[in-house]
């Protein structure tokens, strides 16, 4: 006879979906189980259960049960650890946090443990909560997220000749191949999926990929680096997913409007 096993972990709400008149299906990214989907019984109607704990990017202590690993979990209880109130007061912070959550949701696989990714998301949401909405924060999250999910762009050397990064050389980034070509190797005409990129931008991304989070603000992020890194990472992520995330479209539009 199968009995339900009960588990406890911490998790961020990635998204919710109405399941019935009273229930919700909630997708979390958890510390111990990675991406986890559970049914929250009565969450749509009850004024006592799950009140204000199933909002996007809210971090909570979760208690869930299920009979088998491949079955949908039942959310037994959910207690808030951090609802990030300052993020919710600000449109730009909310949109930025929503994009980070969207990235994690689209790249993560159901119940593939990823404690490092959980900690990455937690640390960057805390930075946004404290008021950091910089281009640097966004790009460094993207490059670290790609590394942890196995999609890190090859930025250490030319993919063709394997020569290490050279300050005297010029480079392009091939979106489809996911890496650098030095100008000595890349001689074909310009193409929409091949982007010129400066050595300064490459070095900044490599440093941002590895540096301790609390030291990120020390890294200079020039206008050129901001433009080049945004084009490279946005197009590369879109290539991997086969689409541009709606959350990024909204974020870009609001930033262009200066709201």
From Swiss-Prot:
<dbReference type="InterPro" id="IPR022572">
    <property type="entry name" value="DNA_rep/recomb_RecO_N"/>
</dbReference>
<comment type="similarity">
    <text>Belongs to the RecO family.</text>
</comment>
<dbReference type="InterPro" id="IPR003717">
    <property type="entry name" value="RecO"/>
</dbReference>
<dbReference type="Pfam" id="PF02565">
    <property type="entry name" value="RecO_C"/>
</dbReference>
<comment type="function">
    <text>Involved in DNA repair and RecF pathway recombination.</text>
</comment>
<dbReference type="InterPro" id="IPR012340">
    <property type="entry name" value="NA-bd_OB-fold"/>
</dbReference>
<dbReference type="GO" id="GO:0043590">
    <property type="term" value="C:bacterial nucleoid"/>
</dbReference>
<keyword id="KW-0233">DNA recombination</keyword>
<dbReference type="Pfam" id="PF11967">
    <property type="entry name" value="RecO_N"/>
</dbReference>
<keyword id="KW-0227">DNA damage</keyword>
<keyword id="KW-0234">DNA repair</keyword>
<dbReference type="GO" id="GO:0006310">
    <property type="term" value="P:DNA recombination"/>
</dbReference>
<protein>
    <recommendedName>
        <fullName>DNA repair protein RecO</fullName>
    </recommendedName>
</protein>
<dbReference type="InterPro" id="IPR042242">
    <property type="entry name" value="RecO_C"/>
</dbReference>
<dbReference type="InterPro" id="IPR037278">
    <property type="entry name" value="ARFGAP/RecO"/>
</dbReference>
<dbReference type="GO" id="GO:0006302">
    <property type="term" value="P:double-strand break repair"/>
</dbReference>
């Amino acid at each position: 006879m199968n009995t339900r096993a009960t588990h406890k972990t911490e998790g961020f709400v990635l998204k919710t979906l109405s399941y019935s008149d009273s229930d919700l299906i909630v997708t979390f990214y958890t510390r111990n189980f990675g991406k986890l989907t559970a049914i929250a019984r009565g969450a749509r109607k009850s004024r006592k259960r799950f009140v204000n704990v199933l909002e996007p990017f809210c971090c909570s202590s979760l208690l869930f049960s299920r009979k088998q690993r491949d079955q949908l979990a039942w959310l037994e209880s959910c207690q808030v650890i951090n609802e990030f109130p300052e993020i919710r007061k600000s449109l730009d912070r909310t949109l930025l946090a929503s994009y980070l959550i969207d990235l994690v949701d689209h790249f993560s696989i159901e119940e593939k443990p990823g404690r490092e990714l959980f900690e990455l998301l937690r640390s960057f949401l805390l930075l946004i909560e404290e008021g950091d909405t910089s281009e640097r924060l966004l790009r460094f999250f993207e490059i670290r997220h790609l590394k942890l999910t196995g999609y890190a762009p090859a930025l250490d050397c030319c993919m063709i000749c394997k020569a290490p990064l050279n300050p005297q050389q010029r480079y392009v980034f091939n979106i489809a191949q996911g890496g650098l070509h030095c100008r000595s190797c890349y001689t074909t005409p310009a193409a929409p999926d091949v982007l010129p990129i400066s050595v300064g931008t490459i070095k900044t991304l490599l440093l941002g990929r590895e540096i301790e989070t609390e030291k990120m603000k020390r890294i200079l992020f020039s206008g050129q680096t901001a433009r080049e890194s945004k084009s490279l990472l946005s197009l590369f992520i879109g290539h991997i997913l086969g689409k541009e995330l709606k959350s990024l479209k909204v974020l870009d539009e609001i930033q262009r409007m200066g709201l």
